[in-house]
Each structure stands twice: as structure tokens, then as C-alpha cells.
Amino acid sequence: MTANLAARRWWMIMPIIFITYSLAYLDRANYGFAAAAGINQDLGISKGLSSLIGALFFLGYFFFQIPGAIYAERRSVKTLVFWSLVLWGACAALTGVVSNIPSLMAIRFLLGVVEAAVMPAMLIYISNWFTKRERSRANTFLILGNPVTVLWMSVVSGYLVHEFGWRHMFIAEGVPAILWAVCWWFLVQDKPAQANWLTAQEKRDLDAALAAEQAAIKPMRNYGEAFRSPAVIKLCAQYFCWSIGVYGFVLWLPSIVKNGSALGMVATGWLSALPYLAATIAMLAASWASDRLGSRRGFVWPFLLIGAAAFAASYALGSTHFWISYALLVVAGAAMYAPYGPFFAIVPELLPKNVAGGAMALINSMGALGSFVGSYFVGYLNGATGSPVASYAFMSAALVAAVILTLSVKPQARDAQTLGAPLQGKMHQ
């Protein structure tokens, strides 16, 4: 019965959340192709302002994470994500009809606002349906929407901007989110008890397994207590630094590739896709091994260290060896994405359910702030220096800081094996 239940949950839930998060990532990441395809010249945007506009999404994303997570935890993930889909699809499509810089800035900020709650809501949704031993893989299937989307989006966006221009690209890639909102509404149930495709016994078994996990976690009274815990504070700082590298890479990779290779937009799209193919493979391998070995932290920091080393090597090469630097960027992209599943499995194993969703939202909001910093400063450094070399050093340093912070997280003794922490003396939270 357990095997049948597990198989049914994977097939009924994972495709839905994968598609949903893929559409969210599509509408936030395609600005890099517009920047490479002439939006700056068409609207009279300077290089410095282009960096700010590209990063404004993450500023809106930062402010509305926690309110959205609280609503999802206490009320309904289904309702929250439905309206988010409709609104972000509309904002993304409207980007294609902007005629001036202020309207573009407003839409980029609003896009971040309406997408803000989706990631923490999805993580809460996964924690309602999957047990501790499954969560790293479940998180990975959610976050696979990132690299898989950028993989095909790089090719499709490159073609669209080449054939039709950046305006048609935004419109064509915004409409699917609105259409998918209808599918989401009819396919999703918030809790196992509401699912008509589970038997009564399967519902009881799943509820019992999830309740048993909660009984093993130290209780916390409220969000304030959770937010003040050393582990949450360190994970916030870690995700801030990690996201500097990830989104500095994601948003400006098309421009780096186009300028360095001197190829057209279609070829740029194909080259920009390859790091995300490598990232997809790395994420699947890391999440499977993390659940199999029961280790979380041990599948986070080594990959981030590899990413830092790849960026550092690109910095050392300078701007005269593009193809070697490009190969290192493929390595860096795979290494930065690989740890997502294990990382987001840490918090539900440290904190009780009544505060875990809010804590994940806080951590994700700090990641959004790091994404803003990475998006802005990588774009700024590329424009100010005329090459991506300085930004490689910046992203490498951020990932090294993330490695140090990951190693500093000390779980409770009973959670040490799960987090893969070395036991040296008495462990404490």
C-alpha cells in the first residue's frame, strides 16, 4: 500500500507543480534575452539602468514572501497560486507593450510582487504531501522548473527575438501562465484529505506518517521564535550569498555569451541552454543521493565550492579565452543548481510545521534580496568594465561565503545525521 501511495502522489502532484513553477521562472528569466536583443536601445535605457530594471523583479519578490507564505500555510495554497498565475501572466505579457522606462520598471517590480509567494507556497504544499525521506527529491522536481525552463526558454526566446522581436517574446511567454491557472484550479487539492484519488486508508497512513515526523521536532510557539533561531539566521545569510551567484549568472548569461562569442541570437540561445542541461542532471543526482544517504548539508556546500572554483578559474583566464570560460560557466551553472533539493529539505526537518513555512519564506526572501544584488551588480560590472571578468570574481566570492555559512549551521543532535553535519562535541541548535 505504501508503495502504491507513494507512486500515485508522485504522478498526480509532481507534474502539476513542475509546470507551475516552470511558468513562473520563464517570466522572470526572459528579460536577459530582451536585454541582449535591443530593449535598451529601443527604450533608451543606459547600461546602469538596465541592470537596475533587470533586478527590480527581485525587490518586489523580497517584500511579499512572508505574507504569502502565512496565507498559504493558514488558508490555501490552491487559491494563492491560482491568482498568482493569472496576475504574473498578465504582468509578463504587458511587458511586451511598454513604451517608456517608468512603465517597464513598474511592471518588473509588480511581476516580483505577484510571484513572491509561489516558491514558499509550493514548499508548504510539498510538506503537506511528502515525508521527510522523500522531500529532497520532491523539492528537486519543483525546482527543476528553473533549469529545465531556462534550457528550452533559451532556445525559444532566442528564436522569438530573432524572428519577431522582444515585444512578441514577452507576450507569447506571458499568456501560458494565464491559461494554466484554469488547469491548476481543477487539478489541485490543498491536503491529502481532500483528494478523491486516495483511498481512506491511504489518507490515514499519510497523515499518520507526517504527524509522527512533527512529534520528533522541537516545538516552537510562533514565527518570532523561529526567525530568531541561529540556524534560520545563518540559512538566510547563506541563501542571500548563494542567490547572488545564481541570478547574476541566470539574468546576464545571454549577454555574456553573445558579447563573448560574437554569435547571433539563435546560437546564443543554444549556448545559453547548455548549462541548464548540466544543472538538470546534477540536481537529480544530488537529490537522489541526499535522500538515499539521509544527508542534507553534505550535498550543499561541496557543490557551491565547485561553483566558486569555476568562477574563480574564469576570472583567472580573463576575457581572451571565451570558450574555456564558457566550459567553466557550464560547470558553475550545474554546481549552483545541484543543491536546491537538499537545501530546502533542511528547514522542515529543523522546525515544526506551524513555523516552517514562514521560515522558508524568510529564507527565500533573503534569497530574493541576494538575487537583486547579484542581478544588479553583475550587470553593472559587465557594463562598467566591458567584460564579465570582474563579475566572475564577485560571484565566486559570494559562493565561498555561502559555503562557510552552510558549514556553520549546527543542527540539533537528533537531526545531525539528516543534515550530514560532523559530530564534534555536543551538538546544539
Where are these regions (language model features)?
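C-terminal transmembrane helical hairpin of 12-TM major facilitator-type secondary transporters
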Residues: R296-I346
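Cytoplasmic helix-loop-helix junction between adjacent transmembrane helices
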Residues: I107-G145
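Helix-to-loop junctions at the C-terminal end of transmembrane segments
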Residues: F64-S76, M283-S295, N382
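Conserved MFS/SLC helix-loop-helix module at the cytosolic interface between two early adjacent transmembrane helices
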Residues: F63-P102
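Cytoplasmic membrane-interface "Motif A"-like loop-to-helix N-cap segments
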Residues: E73-L85, D291-L304
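Helix-breaking motifs and short loop linkers at transmembrane-helix boundaries and internal kinks
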Residues: G44, S76, V97-S103, V114, ...
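Extracytoplasmic gate region of multi-pass secondary transporters
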Residues: G32-F33, S229-S287, Y340, F344, ...
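Helix-loop-helix hairpin linking two adjacent transmembrane segments in secondary transporters
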Residues: L142-A195
